[in-house]
Each structure stands twice: as C-alpha cells, then as structure tokens.
Amino acid sequence: MQITHLGHSCVLIETAGQRVLVDPGDFSTAWRGLTDLDAVLVTHQHPDHADPVWLPRLLDANPNAMVAVESSVVDIVD
C-alpha cells in the first residue's frame, strides 16, 4: 500500500490494483487530471475537501470510479 499526500486534506491511496482519492479540495491541485481512479471519497462539503469546480471534472475523467460522499456533497457531484 502506498499513501501519497497531494496537499492539504487530499491523499491518494494505492493498493494492488486499486486507487482511491480522498478529499480532492481546492487547497490542493496535484489531484487535478488524475485518471484510472477506482473510487473518490469526500468526507464533507467544505471547499478544502470538495472543490466545487474541479470535482465534477475529476468524476467525468473517471467515469467508472465509485463515488462515496457525505450527504451535503451530493449536489456538487450530481
């Protein structure tokens, strides 16, 4: 398992064959453009954990990724 801190609250967790991105917020940019994600997890709605502009773009670039979000984030990703 490899855990990479991408800035502020954002981390990329990689295991054998799985890539999970956690809290892609607007205080970090290293996650923008990531592809081949298996899942995206957002813990809550604050912009430093869920970038309202770039998160939808990330999900478009990873159409097969499972998305797990706290209920207040649904409007951002829907």
Task: Write out the residue ranges for each language-model feature.
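Short, intrinsically disordered, charge-balanced linker/junction segments flanking boundaries
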Residues: 74-78
